[in-house]
């Protein structure tokens, strides 16, 4: 289903299990592991040294300053600096957000041991550790594609057009300037669109360190990947360390 280690810039994953996720489980926000990327180009550090100890302590302490679903920090040891960025989904409760990040902290250390650069995604959150300064910057290198194994019935081109239209509408909602910064749903949007007898549900989000302008650029970049990711599929998502979208033919966000 998922590979155990990935170090490529663009990752395509067919998530077969999406076909079997029940609507109720989706609304309960299951904290499913999605995928990770070990960024081997940033090198590795020696195990059990002061760098690793400082990083673990830093991750533990960051869970206590989770005020609005987004955290970032900088630290280092042995003349090396690391940057940490983590964010929860805009509809995740504080308890689910905290639980997801605890899981991400341990998961990323286990799946990418000693990597200086690494990213891990779960359904409710993601975590990014890098020696490259990433704050306020759009990541154009690392993408994760997930899609439902089932194709839509009927006109695929029309469905793709309707999906893009919903995502475009949600993008405008996510970057609205009247939003209050430093709130859990800042630069986050969710909505639905009627497609005859069915409904299409969508969600978009940027990391809260981005400016509204950069959020717009990032969302445009992942919407442009819709044909490559999810052509005619009943559901799909593009994940990136700076922004994300998801759509399904069933409700999956918390109202």
From Swiss-Prot:
Compartments reported by the entry: Secreted
Q: Which keywords has UniProt assigned to this entry?
A: Repeat, Secreted, Signal
The leader peptide range reads 1-26
Domain of life from the UniProt record:
Eukaryota
Q: Which Pfam families match?
A: Stress-antifung (PF01657)
Under the heading InterPro entries, the entry gives: CRR_secretory_protein (IPR050581), GNK2 (IPR002902), GNK2_sf (IPR038408)
Domain named Gnk2-homologous: residues: 33-134, 140-252
An annotated GO cellular component of this protein is: extracellular region
Family that this chain belongs to: Belongs to the cysteine-rich repeat secretory protein family.
According to UniProt, the name of this protein is: Putative cysteine-rich repeat secretory protein 10
Q: Which organism is it from?
A: Arabidopsis thaliana (Mouse-ear cress)
Underlying gene:
CRRSP10
């Amino acid at each position: 289903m998922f590979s155990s280690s990935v170090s490529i810039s663009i990752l395509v994953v067919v998530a077969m299990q999406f076909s079997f996720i029940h609507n109720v489980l989706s609304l309960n926000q299951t904290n499913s592991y999605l995928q990770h990327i070990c960024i081997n180009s940033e090198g590795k550090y020696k195990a059990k040294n002061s760098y690793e100890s400082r990083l673990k302590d830093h991750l533990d302490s960051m869970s206590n300053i989770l005020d609005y679903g987004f955290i970032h920090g900088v630290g280092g040891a042995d003349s090396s600096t690391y940057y940490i960025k983590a964010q929860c989904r805009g509809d995740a409760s504080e308890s689910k957000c905290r639980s997801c990040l605890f899981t991400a902290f341990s998961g990323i250390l286990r799946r990418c041991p000693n990597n200086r650069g690494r990213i891990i995604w779960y359904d409710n959150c993601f975590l990014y550790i890098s020696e490259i300064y990433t704050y306020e910057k759009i990541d154009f290198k690392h993408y994760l594609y997930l899609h439902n194994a089932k194709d839509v019935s009927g006109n695929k081109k029309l469905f793709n057009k309707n999906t893009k239209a919903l995502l475009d509408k949600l993008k405008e909602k996510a970057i609205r300037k009247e939003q209050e910064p430093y709130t859990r749903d800042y630069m986050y949007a969710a909505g639905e669109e009627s497609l005859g007898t069915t409904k299409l549900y969508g969600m978009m989000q940027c990391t809260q360190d981005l400016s509204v302008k950069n959020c717009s650029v990032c969302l445009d970049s992942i919407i442009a990947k819709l044909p490559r990711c999810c052509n005619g599929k009943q559901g799909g998502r593009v994940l990136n360390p700076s922004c994300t979208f998801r759509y399904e033919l069933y409700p999956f966000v918390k109202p």
